[in-house]
Amino acid sequence: MGEPIYRRVVVKLSGEYFAGPQSYGIDQSTIDRVAGDLIAARGLGVEIAVVVGGGNIFRGVEVSARGVSRPTGDTMGMLATVMNCLALGEALQRHGQKARTLSSFVMPQVCDLYTRAAAQQTLGEGGIALLAGGTGNPFFTTDTTAVLRAAEIGADAVLKATNVDGVYSADPKRDPKATRFERLTHSEALAGGYKVMDATAFALARETSLPIIVFSIAEPGSIGTVLGGAGRATVVAG
């Protein structure tokens, strides 16, 4: 791993990835591997906050198509992100890394309430801040949450961990002619309609001048590699 080019980041992790080889739930070996990667990255001196999706447990958009209202479905999905953060937090602590789950929902028996000050305190004390509960409002994705929280806590970048190694002109799993972009501006990402993040997230990143680095989480150690400015990834900035 090279010298990190960022000092404070928000890492956005897919909830689906937490399911591992399963299609649902939490795969402990996958959680442990992600925890190890985060700890190694933290060891570089980088302050790390994490936003996790909830798609391995619940997807509000899908259930809303089956009769549940979109606000209720989205709220259920945001609660699923709390479960994922609790699982990741326990794995981090088991490996000796201080971690704190901060939720946009008030649930004092489970975790602390997210505030900007609480997140910054956790980072300043060497802990990894796990930012759960989405924005706390329906109709906003956890990608948008990651950009919002990054702007709030003064992060240098959002690291978007996916199952592909960057932003492509088309789905590389379906189109063998798809090409990977090394760099895109926020406006180009918006105009291209690339599905790696939603338009609201890209628009907010543009407004707040936040770089987004899209990379594959499949390779062990990839978080640290990206922090050093190396590896295969797409940088969305400018």
Curated annotation (Swiss-Prot):
It catalyses: UMP + ATP = UDP + ADP. It is an enzyme of class 2 (transferase). The keyword Cytoplasm applies. GO terms for molecular function: ATP binding; UMP kinase activity. This is Uridylate kinase. Homohexamer. UMP binds at G54, D74, T135, G136, N137, P138, F139, F140, T141, T142. Inhibited by UTP. Keywords: ATP-binding, Cytoplasm, Kinase, Nucleotide-binding, Pyrimidine biosynthesis, Transferase. Pathway: Pyrimidine metabolism; CTP biosynthesis via de novo pathway; UDP from UMP (UMPK route): step 1/1. Its main location: cytoplasm. Signal peptide: none annotated. CDD domains: AAK_UMPK-PyrH-Ec. It is found in: Cytoplasm. Belongs to the UMP kinase family. Catalyzes the reversible phosphorylation of UMP to UDP.
